[in-house]
């Protein structure tokens, strides 16, 4: 504020000595008021902001601040020695003409600007500038547009929409006043009434919002679809004030926000900063793969991880850094996890490659760790796994080391008796010594998944049956077990507590094993035999023995030639069966489908690729399960069968018919397993194997096309003749080899 100009009348009307003395008294009084209010009369947010800066920085640096208030403060500072001098009694009438508003006069540039809101999405910047040129010459027109989105399909519009708010600068302030005083009808453009308001700069307004001098006069103005920043800010402030939200509620709301939004809220104000920091106390689990802010264009870096874990690490119980696009410095990243997250119970660092020393440091710091996942580490050696488990392996209850191609298992001796679940699928180099160490140190193991662990032996399986009495889940899928025999698989029948067993693609499965399992595993509830054994090793006798598993709820017998209608009739005694998959069962006919009508708890039936199944049995199955209140739906998959969708009716039934053909999934898995077998050292060449697979697939497709699209012959009503015909056709097509 220019004090010389403010008191010009006082200085000119009295003598110089008396006038100076009166001025000093007035300034001293003003100085006292300023000291009480801690600012230059504390009149606006601009002065408050400036005084805040002045209190926290030395007065000598104020010359770098070029605002109007800074210049006035420098003048005021030069008069401080005189203000502190003693004087006579102060006459209050001498300062009655003091006008504080002169310090806040609008600059000429701001007077020439206006803010236009509620702009139609069709309006372009040139159109808007041409429209307002009727009020005067325009020097600039800024109409921001939304961020342009991209799509590989080319379905998005070529031009992005405008944001609905523009800033226009006129050459003269009189022209801006004309636009402000214009009638609403004059501001109608594309059937929308635009709203013109005064421009308030960020420096004078104190906030980055568009403010207006006549908010009340526009409260009743009808607005169209778009809404300006002004109307949004004023409307939300009148209806709902976030400052009145209780701290606990605000903290709870912030805890549900994405991580990057939670960190951004710290910049809003002091209250939001405090509640944002406290909200991390409510977050005990973080899965970084869910944070969409990290992608190929913006990968996660170590600084991002540190910023997150310094806030949330002390409260985290579970951390998952797998599946995220990152450029992490592996050593520093693991050090950040080890330092910031001492209370972790569950950790997934899959995809994070690191040296053995960094893994050892991580294991030392996580004394409470119970679940560890480090899967897909195809290039990580056995040494790294050893140092990772060296200090925390004894306390682990769950370990996932799937697809660790270079893992031999020397670290398994570090596991303790608390280990309950171990996943080793695809870790093909885990040898027999590792399984011996596992049986010695982990007698309480309940879940063991060793699919494609091809170095396991008969002795290992026997030791597992004897030492792991609590084992309830066992998976032994794959077709490359060279050190395992069919006789060794019989040891599985001695594991009395097994409830889930999977032997998919295991060529060692035979009738003897199925009969032993049916007699020795009374608690078995899930059995998977997809593509197991061969046509000669698994017969109808072995599959029929499954009827003795009274607790069975899930069964997968896909691609087993022994599965036919007679076998399904015997399996109809499994009253608890809920899910049954019979894909590519080429000898399964309508009678087998009718046998499922005796299963009251059935929920899912997959008949994909079972080409002898027709509309008759499918329609009977649909009618057997009428709809009713609180009755769950039943899914019936009939893709690849002889079913005709146009002749099926599901009215009044709770059966949902799915015409998808999932039998190709089985074919793909077969080809993958075959290729892996050749890579290990099969006798056939890759070219010969590929030709055999192609011929088998072609024969199967030809058989299916002939069955569905061929010319109709006289129907065969006798089941025996139908079976003979199917066998004859299969032999002629090469599906059955003598």
Curated annotation (Swiss-Prot):
Any Gene Ontology biological process: SCF-dependent proteasomal ubiquitin-dependent protein catabolic process
Any one Gene Ontology molecular-function term assigned to this protein's record: RNA binding
A GO cellular-component term linked to this record: SCF ubiquitin ligase complex
Domain F-box: 239-297
Sequence ranges assigned to domain RRM in this UniProt record: 112-201
This protein's UniProt keywords: RNA-binding
Bias (Polar residues): 224-237
SUPFAM superfamilies per UniProt: RNA-binding domain, RBD, RNI-like
Region (Disordered): 211-237
Protein name from the UniProt record: Putative RNA-binding protein EEED8.10
Organism: Caenorhabditis elegans
Protein encoded by which gene: fbxl-3
């Amino acid at each position: 504020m220019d004090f010389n100009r403010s008191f010009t009348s006082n200085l000119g009307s009295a003598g110089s000595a008396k006038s100076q003395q009166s001025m000093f008294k007035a300034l001293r009084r003003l100085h006292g008021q300023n000291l009480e209010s801690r600012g230059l009369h504390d009149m606006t947010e601009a002065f408050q902001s400036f005084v805040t800066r002045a209190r926290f920085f030395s007065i000598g640096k104020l010359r770098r601040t070029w605002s109007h208030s800074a210049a006035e403060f420098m003048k005021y500072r030069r008069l401080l020695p005189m203000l502190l001098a003693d004087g006579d009694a102060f006459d209050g009438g001498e300062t009655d003409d003091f006008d504080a508003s002169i310090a806040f006069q609008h600059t000429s540039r701001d007077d020439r600007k206006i803010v236009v809101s509620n702009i139609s999405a069709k309006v372009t910047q040139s159109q808007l500038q041409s429209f307002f040129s009727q009020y005067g010459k325009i020097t600039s027109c800024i109409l921001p547009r939304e961020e342009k989105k991209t799509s590989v399909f080319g379905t998005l519009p070529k031009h992005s929409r405008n944001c609905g708010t523009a800033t226009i600068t006129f050459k003269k302030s009189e022209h801006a006043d004309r636009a402000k005083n214009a009638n609403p009808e004059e501001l109608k453009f594309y059937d929308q009434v635009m709203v013109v308001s005064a421009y308030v700069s960020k420096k004078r307004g104190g906030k980055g919002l568009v403010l207006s001098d006549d908010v009340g006069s526009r409260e009743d103005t009808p607005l169209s679809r778009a809404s300006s920043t002004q109307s949004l800010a004023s409307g939300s402030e009148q209806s709902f004030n976030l400052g009145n939200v209780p701290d606990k509620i605000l903290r709870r709301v912030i805890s549900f926000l994405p991580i990057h939004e939670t960190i951004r809220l710290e910049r809003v104000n002091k209250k939001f900063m405090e509640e944002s920091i406290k909200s991390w106390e409510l977050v005990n689990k973080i899965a970084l793969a869910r944070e969409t802010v990290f992608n190929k264009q913006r990968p996660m870096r170590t600084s991002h991880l540190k910023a997150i874990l310094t806030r949330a690490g002390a409260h985290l119980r579970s951390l998952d850094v797998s599946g995220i696009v990152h450029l992490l410095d592996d050593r520093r990243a693991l050090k950040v996890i080890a330092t910031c997250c001492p209370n972790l119970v569950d950790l997934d660092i899959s995809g994070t490659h690191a040296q053995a020393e960094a893994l050892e440091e991580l294991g030392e710091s996580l004394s409470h760790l119970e679940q560890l996942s480090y899967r897909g580490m195809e290039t990580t050696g056995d040494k790294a796994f050893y140092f990772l488990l060296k200090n925390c392996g004894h306390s682990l209850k769950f370990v996932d080391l799937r697809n660790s191609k270079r893992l031999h298992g020397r670290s398994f001796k570090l596991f303790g008796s608390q280990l309950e679940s171990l996943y080793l699928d695809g870790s093909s180099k885990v040898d027999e010594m590792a399984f011996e160490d596992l049986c010695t140190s982990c007698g309480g193991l309940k879940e063991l998944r060793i699919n494609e662990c091809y170095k396991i032996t008969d002795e290992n399986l026997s030791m597992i049956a004897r030492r792991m009495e609590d084992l309830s889940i066992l998976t032994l899928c794959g077709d490359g077990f060279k050190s395992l025999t069919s006789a060794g698989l019989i040891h599985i029948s001695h594991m009395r507590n097994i409830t889930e067993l999977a032997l998919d693609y295991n060529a060692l499965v035979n009738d003897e094993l199925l009969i032993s399992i049916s007699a020795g595993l009374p608690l078995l509830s899930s059995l998977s035999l997809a593509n197991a054994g061969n046509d000669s090793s698994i017969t109808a006798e072995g599959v029929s023995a499954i009827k003795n598993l009274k607790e069975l709820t899930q069964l997968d017998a896909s691609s087993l030639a022994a599965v036919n209608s007679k076998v399904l009739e015997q399996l109809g005694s499994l009253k608890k069966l809920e899910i049954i998959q019979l894909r590519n069962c080429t000898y399964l006919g309508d009678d087998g489908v009718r046998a499922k009508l005796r299963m009251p708890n059935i929920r899912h039936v997959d008949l994909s690729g079972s080409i002898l199944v027709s509309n008759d049995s499918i329609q009977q199955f649909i009618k057997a399960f009428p709809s009713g209140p609180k009755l769950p739906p039943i899914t019936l998959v009939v893709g690849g069968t002889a079913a005709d969708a146009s002749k099926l009716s599901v009215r009044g039934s709770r059966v949902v018919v799915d015409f998808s053909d999932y039998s190709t999934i089985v074919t793909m898995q077969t080809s993958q397993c075959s290729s892996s077998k050749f890579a290990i050292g099969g006798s056939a060449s890759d070219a010969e194997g590929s030709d055999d697979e192609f011929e088998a697939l072609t024969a199967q497709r030809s058989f299916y096309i002939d069955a569905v699209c061929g010319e109709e012959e006289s129907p065969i009503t006798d089941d025996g003749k139908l079976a003979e015909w199917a066998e004859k056709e299969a032999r002629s097509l090469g599906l059955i080899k003598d």
